[in-house]
C-alpha cells in the first residue's frame, strides 16, 4: 500500500498530468518530499487542516468500503416490522433496499440535494424507529420524487478519489450528525461544539439555518478563541464571505461561500464590517446614479 505522501503525489499527477505537480506551491512540493521520522506521532504535527463537507451520509459514500460498519454491519438496528433498517417501506407499502447510484451511466450527480432540515430529519428518525426515510426524504424535483433516492449510494468505481483517500488514511465509521438538523446547526457544532448560547435546556437550541445569521448574531465562545487562549494560531480559507463581495455570473456559482461558514455570524468577529464588504458597498454606491438614470429613461 502506498504511503500517504506517495498517494498525494500520485493524486496530483493523475489529476492533471505532470504539469499539475509543477503548479503546486514550492512549500507544498517540499512538504510532500519530506518523509516523517520513524516513531513520530500526531503529537509531532505542526498544522491541522479541517475541511467539512455536507449533504452526504457515511453510508452514501463509504457504505461498501471494506472493514467499516457499512451495509454489512452485523449490528444494524431492526425496524418495528422486524426488517433490518436497510429495508425501508413507504406509505404505499413498497419496500426498497440500498442501491448503487451509477455516476457513469445515470444522472445521479444531478439528482440535487434531498431534504435535510430539522423537521424532516426528526420525521425520518420517527422517535427512534428510523422507518420514514422514503416518505420524508423525497426529492424536491417532481421528476425524481417517486424514486427512492435516499437509499442510493456510491461505490469505489463512482468516487475513486474518495476511496483512495480512505485507503491511504484512517477512516472513522459510525458517522452521524452532531445535530439532527441541517447546515448551519451542524457547522455551529464544528466551530463551537454546541448550538446554544448557554449550556442549559432553558437556552434556545438553534436548530434551523435561519436561527443564526447576520440578522441574528451568536455570541458564545468559539474554538478559534479557545485556540488563541492557548497561544495556538488559526486561519480560515474561503473565497468570499456570505455577504456580497462582487462575484458575478459563474464566479458566484463556483467560488461563493453559500453561507456555509457560520463563524461569520458571531458578533465578536465583526465580519459585517470587513474591508472587502465595505469596498463592495463603495463600488455599488458609485454605480447607483448611473443605474437610477438608466431606470428613468
Sequence positions of predicted segments:
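N-terminal pro-sequences and low-complexity stem/linker regions of secreted or lumenal proteins
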Residues: 2-297
Amino acid at each position: 500500500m502506498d504511503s500517504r505522501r506517495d498517494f498525494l503525489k500520485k493524486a496530483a499527477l493523475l489529476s492533471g498530468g505532470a504539469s499539475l505537480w509543477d503548479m503546486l506551491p514550492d512549500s507544498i512540493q517540499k512538504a510532500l518530499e519530506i518523509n516523517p521520522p520513524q516513531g513520530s506521532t500526531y503529537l509531532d504535527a505542526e498544522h491541522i487542516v479541517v475541511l467539512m463537507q455536507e449533504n452526504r451520509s457515511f453510508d452514501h459514500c463509504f457504505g461498501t468500503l471494506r472493514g467499516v460498519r457499512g451495509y454489512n454491519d452485523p449490528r444494524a438496528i431492526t425496524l418495528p416490522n422486524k426488517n433490518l433498517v436497510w429495508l425501508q417501506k413507504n406509505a404505499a407499502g413498497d419496500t426498497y433496499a440500498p442501491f448503487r447510484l451509477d455516476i457513469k451511466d445515470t444522472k445521479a450527480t444531478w439528482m440535487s440535494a434531498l431534504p435535510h432540515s430539522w423537521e424532516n430529519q426528526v420525521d425520518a428518525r420517527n422517535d427512534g424507529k428510523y422507518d420514514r426515510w422514503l416518505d420524508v426524504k423525497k426529492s424536491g424535483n417532481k421528476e425524481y420524487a417517486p424514486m427512492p433516492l435516499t437509499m442510493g449510494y456510491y461505490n469505489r468505481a463512482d468516487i475513486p478519489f474518495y476511496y483512495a483517500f480512505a485507503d491511504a488514511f484512517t477512516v472513522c465509521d459510525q458517522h452521524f450528525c452532531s445535530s439532527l438538523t441541517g447546515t448551519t446547526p451542524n457547522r455551529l457544532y464544528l466551530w463551537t461544539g454546541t448550538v446554544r448560547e448557554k449550556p442549559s435546556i432553558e437556552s434556545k437550541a438553534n436548530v434551523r439555518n435561519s436561527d443564526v445569521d447576520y440578522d441574528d448574531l451568536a455570541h458564545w465562545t468559539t474554538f478559534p478563541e479557545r485556540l488563541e487562549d492557548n497561544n495556538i494560531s488559526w486561519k480560515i480559507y474561503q473565497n468570499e464571505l456570505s455577504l456580497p463581495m462582487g462575484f458575478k455570473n459563474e464566479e458566484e456559482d463556483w467560488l461563493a461561500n453559500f453561507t456555509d461558514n457560520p463563524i461569520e455570524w458571531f458578533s465578536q468577529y465583526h465580519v459585517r464590517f470587513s474591508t472587502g464588504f465595505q469596498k463592495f458597498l463603495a463600488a455599488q454606491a458609485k454605480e447607483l446614479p448611473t443605474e437610477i438614470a438608466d431606470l428613468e429613461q
